[in-house]
Amino acid sequence: XXEQKLEGMNEVIKMMD
């Protein structure tokens, strides 16, 4: 689902921080 895709994006944002 889409939820899984959102989780992956969240991880990328955390790494960017």
Swiss-Prot record:
State the superkingdom: Bacteria
> Which miscellaneous remark does the UniProt record hold?
On the 2D-gel the determined pI of this unknown protein is: 5.1, its MW is: 38.9 kDa.
Q: What is this protein called?
A: Unknown protein CP 15 from 2D-PAGE
Source organism of the structure: Clostridium pasteurianum
Lineage start: Bacteria, Bacillati, Bacillota, Clostridia, Eubacteriales
